[in-house]
Amino acid sequence: MTRRRVVVTGLGATTPLGGDVATTWAGLLAGKSGVRSLTEDWAQTIPVTFAARVAVEPSEQMERVEIRRLDRSEQFGLIASREAWKDAGSPEVDKERLGVVVASGIGGVTTLLDQYDILNTKGSRLVSPHTVPMLMPNGPAANIGLELQAQAGVHTPVSACASGAEAIGYAFDMIRNNRADIVVSGGVEAACHALPMAAFAAMKALSTRNDDPARASRPYDLNRDGFVLGEGGGILVLEEYEHAKARGAKIYCEIAGQGLSSDGYHIAAPDPSGAGVQRAVKFALKDADLTTADIVHLNAHATSTPAGDVAEANALRAALGNDADHVAVSATKSMTGHLLGGAGAIESVFIVKTMQDRMAPPTINIDDLDPAVTVDVVRDKPRALPVGDIAALNDSFGFGGHNVVLVFKSI
C-alpha cells in the first residue's frame, strides 16, 4: 500500500522575536536577541533576573474577555494557531478528518501559582472558576480543537523539552495512518515565573549573566553557563499531500520521517555517549528513506548548557559521520531562549522557513567556539543552502531522556 505523504501548509508563531512568523523570521535572520531583563518585582528575589519573554503581549492580539479565561500558554496556542490556520487558507475540511496535537512541557504553571497566591491571600471564594481548564497541560490543544471543531482527535504529548517535536511527529502519524487529513500541530510554553525560574536556577541549569542578558544564551561557546528561559509557541498545519493539492493549497515542504528514542540514563542529564540521539537520527532517516548524504541543514537542540551542547554535537557527528561536514547547524535558542515544550515546535517552523528561503539562520554569541564541538555551526550571519532537492533535521531532547528527530524535505 502506498504510504500517505504529509506536507506543511500553514505556519504560526508568537515568540521573543515577534508576534507572528514573518517578524520572528526576520529577527532570526538578523541575529537579533529576544532576551531581556525582567521588570516584575519577583525577579529581584531569584538568582536570574532575565528571560526571553514574547515580543508582543497577548493583550495586543486578543480580546480582554478571552484572555481572562485562558492561561498564558493557551493564549499563545490560539494566537499561533489562528495565524497558521489563516496561512493554510482556512481550509474547508470534514471535522471528523481534522485533528489537533499541541504540546506543553509544563502546562498552566503560572495559573497554578497565581491562583494559589489568591487562595492564600484572599480566600477560596476568589479563586477563579476557570482555574482547572486553565492549568491543564492539554488546555492549549483543547482550546484550539474547540475553536476549529476538530473531531479526529485532540492530543497533548508531554515529554519535557521534546514535547513540541513529539506533537508534530504524532500529528504526522495521524495523517500517514489515515486517521486525519489535516492536523494542527505544535507546542507552547509559558513558564517565566518565580518558581520555575528559581527551580531551574537551583539545578544550575540557567545562565546567570544578569549584567548582559542579550548575550547570555550562547550555544557552543566555550564560556556558556546555562540556558535562558523563553516563552511562546509555534504551530504547523500538516496536511495529506493529495488533499492539499486538490484544494490548491500552498505547500511549504514535506515531513518525511521521524525518529524516537530514550536514553535510559538520567532524569535530567544527557547521556554523554549520545547513543540515544544517534538511534533517533538513524530511525528518522530510515523512516524518511533518506541517507546522511541527503541532509544539508540541522536545527540543533543546543540549549547553551556546558554538558548538553557537547553531548549533542558529538552524537550528531557520530550519527552523520563524514557527511556532518556538509550539514549547516543552527542553534536558534541563542536568540529565542529555550521555550521548553514549545522549543521543538518553533524550531520546526524555523526549519520550514529555512527550506523555503534556502537560508540557514545564524547562531549568535559565540566568542570562542568550544573545541569539543565538531559540527559545522552557522555563526553570526545566515548561510545560503544548496539549490535543488534538500532535506533537514530538527532534533529535540527532554528531561527523562526523550529524543525526537524530525525530517523535513523539499517538495
Locate each region found by the language model.
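Flexible, low-complexity linker/loop segments at domain and module junctions
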Residues: M1-V8, E92-K95, A288-D294, D325, ...
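Condensing-enzyme catalytic core mediating Claisen C-C bond formation in acyl metabolism
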Residues: R5-T9, G34-S37, D211-A288, H297
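Acyl-CoA/ACP chain-elongation machinery
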Residues: R179-D225, Q258-P272, A300-D309, H326-D376
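ACP-dependent fatty acid/polyketide chain-elongation machinery
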Residues: M1-E66, E242-E254, V349-T363, K409-I411
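Conserved small-residue
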Residues: G10, L28, S81, V100, ...
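Feature captures the FAD/FMN-dependent oxidoreductase FAD-binding
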Residues: E74-K95, G99-S104
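Conserved catalytic cysteine-centered active-site region
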Residues: M1-R4, S37-I79, G107-Y170, R179, ...
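Short, well-ordered amphipathic alpha-helical segments that serve as non-catalytic structural scaffolds
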Residues: G77-K86, P140, A167, E239-E240, ...
